[in-house]
Amino acid sequence: MPLRGIVDGPLATGHSWARLSITMKPLVAAMFLTTFFPFFGNAAEKLAVGAKLPAVTCNDQDGKAVELAKAGAEGYLLVYFYPKASTPGCTKQGCSLRDAWAQLQKQGVRVYGVSTDNESSQKQFKDEQSFPFALLADKDKAVTEAFGVKNLVGMASRSAFLFKDGVCVWVDPKGSTADQADQVMAFLKTRSR
């Protein structure tokens, strides 16, 4: 139902923005701002190389609690962040890692995807895309805040962090989409020399 006097006047006629529901406008605005305006990026400092894996706990898509510090205490752990499940860029990022799963496994890399979506959205996204890794539902934003990737509109900024034995060894501050796995593998090749 349109707001009287705001979106139903002569200027609103025919404009798709005016026809969006009241509940959709904030989501569309948030997606637009985080996509096209980098100054709406992070409100805090992102973790840097050398930082310890934050001791935060978050539920995965099935409601199972995951303690990140414990999960990443030994070996490689990739934690990647995306703004919204089932959106084009986020799907490309996850599918890149899915498609390189065998290569990542050979290198001993475990993967967690994180967004501020709820568990059911994460489960649907995981199932639709056949992701072989867990997706964390950071509804209370504890993980995004601990990693310094919560943007000014409260969503996770696209980024990725690779940990070795609980210490950050690589950061992709902008979070690649279709080539996320390639960038991780390229870094791992430099470590094996």
What is the role of each PLM region?
Residues 71-91:
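Short active-site neighborhood of thiol/selenol oxidoreductases, capturing the structured segment around
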Residues 22-26:
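Positively charged n-region of N-terminal signal peptides that target proteins for export
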Residues 58, 112, 126-158:
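Short, internal strand/loop/helix patches
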Residues 157-193:
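Thiol-/selenol-based redox modules, centered on thioredoxin-like
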Residues 57-76:
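A short beta-strand-turn-helix
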Residues 91-129, 141-143:
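Structural microenvironment flanking redox-active thiols in thiol-disulfide oxidoreductases
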Residues 31-55:
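N-proximal helix/coil linker or "cap" segments that precede and/or mark the start of modular domains
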